[in-house]
UniProtKB/Swiss-Prot annotation:
CDD domains: GEWL
Keyword Signal applies: yes
Tissue specificity remark: Granulocyte compartment of myelomonocytic cells.
Species per Swiss-Prot/TrEMBL record: Gallus gallus (Chicken)
Key words, A-Z: Antimicrobial, Bacteriolytic enzyme, Disulfide bond, Glycosidase, Hydrolase, Secreted, Signal
Protein name (Swiss-Prot/TrEMBL): Lysozyme g
GO cellular component, one term: extracellular region
Compartments where located: Secreted
Amino acid sequence: MLGKNDPMCLVLVLLGLTALLGICQGGTGCYGSVSRIDTTGASCRTAKPEGLSYCGVRASRTIAERDLGSMNKYKVLIKRVGEALCIEPAVIAGIISRESHAGKILKNGWGDRGNGFGLMQVDKRYHKIEGTWNGEAHIRQGTRILIDMVKKIQRKFPRWTRDQQLKGGISAYNAGVGNVRSYERMDIGTLHDDYSNDVVARAQYFKQHGY
């Protein structure tokens, strides 16, 4: 217990609280880290349309490398949103790469037969569109949707590690929480049955390149 004559102790306590608040405000690891997630990478069904003769993590990294130049246009926004919402910017970049190749395949900001909007392909049938297709408001909306999926997976699978729950949330971003039934088979039912594995492998690449 601090006394009136313990100013140094009080200073140390305040410094500790300040440091703790700094971690909470500026951190990006609230939902786990892609660096610790196991992944099989892209399926051949995802890799083949990209003109690749190989599959797996190597294919995911090749695709991410191709997207890096375009992704870097949004790096500041992606990192800002990641820090604000306490999730790794690399995860956001991985989803943007998978959903829109960092905007390269969109037409006037739209994809998925006119249903998906923006870099993160927010579906207009289920969400009220926010911001411009490549702006911070859009990235923030897509990331909030992702975090909501992660939180629902946390409640559904409380015994999973944070990293496993993050991977489950990524899978649910594509096919919904109901599609995630087990850790090993969470991607069955996602597009090409590889969504979270491909996104995680791409995210690992982006994390190694400053995201």
